[in-house]
Amino acid sequence: MIRAIVTDIEGTTSDIRFVHNVLFPYARERLAGFVTAQQYAEPVKTILDNLRRETDAPAASTADLITTLFAFMDEDRKSTALKALQGIIWRDGYLNGDFTGHLYPDVLPALEKWKAQGIDLYVYSSGSVAAQKLLFGYSDEGDITHLFTGYFDTLVGAKREVQSYRNIAEHLGHAPGTILFLSDIHQELDAAEAAGLRTIQLVRGDRDPASHHPQVQRFDDIHPEQIPA
């Protein structure tokens, strides 16, 4: 019996184009000015200090760090410091009404159904927990954060590492086989499966021929009650 569902965001609950065509450019345009203006104020000061440790550059200037952050964006590096700064900038965008968090129309009804069935819902994304809460708090469907019991980001580990999913299972307090992980990336699902979790792959476009995981196109194609223990 599935007791908890952990879902990815990008390409799973939300269109990847929203992240890459709206969120990323919005943060990139504002990053340098924001970091320069806030470098001595919290939480930016601590984030920059963490970035110096992350890059093993204790003497790096703010200008150096900004250059590093732009390089990380170009590489799509899953840097905890970068994700934290992006999340702060996106908060202003959500609060100002510059955009709302995209949700596929099949997502909310399924989440509500699973919640009503007594299944705990969690999010695991490379974006910071703060950014996750913003997307679901200011979504196309309004604030749906009440549906989620908890959130995980790269602080629990990278999404293609088996140990990350062991950490999540330990935190949830459920046997791994009672946890279902949803993602559009088969390498993430491979890691989750190796940790003992159940897996389903969301394929919003063409099927993934390199994947052995069950593939569905919509959340309403997922029936956790039919997954054997």
Curated annotation (Swiss-Prot):
Pfam family, one: Hydrolase
CDD domains: HAD_EP (cd01629)
Record flagged with keyword RNA-binding: no
Keyword hit for Ribosomal protein: no
InterPro entries (alphabetical): Enolase-ppase_E1 (IPR023943), HAD-like_sf (IPR036412), HAD-SF_hydro_IA (IPR006439), HAD_sf (IPR023214)
Gene3D superfamilies according to UniProt: 1.10.720.60, HAD superfamily/HAD-like
Cofactor remark: Binds 1 Mg(2+) ion per subunit.
UniProt record, GO biological process: L-methionine salvage from methylthioadenosine
Entry GO MF terms: 2,3-diketo-5-methylthiopentyl-1-phosphate enolase activity; 2-hydroxy-3-keto-5-methylthiopentenyl-1-phosphate phosphatase activity; acireductone synthase activity; magnesium ion binding
Compositional bias ranges of the Basic and acidic residues kind: 218-229
Annotated EC: 3.1.3.77
Cofactor(s) listed in the protein's UniProt record: Mg(2+)
Pathway(s) it belongs to: Amino-acid biosynthesis; L-methionine biosynthesis via salvage pathway; L-methionine from S-methyl-5-thio-alpha-D-ribose 1-phosphate: step 3/6; Amino-acid biosynthesis; L-methionine biosynthesis via salvage pathway; L-methionine from S-methyl-5-thio-alpha-D-ribose 1-phosphate: step 4/6
Subunit record text: Monomer.
Function: Bifunctional enzyme that catalyzes the enolization of 2,3-diketo-5-methylthiopentyl-1-phosphate (DK-MTP-1-P) into the intermediate 2-hydroxy-3-keto-5-methylthiopentenyl-1-phosphate (HK-MTPenyl-1-P), which is then dephosphorylated to form the acireductone 1,2-dihydroxy-3-keto-5-methylthiopentene (DHK-MTPene).
Protein name, entry field: Enolase-phosphatase E1
Organism: Klebsiella pneumoniae (strain 342)
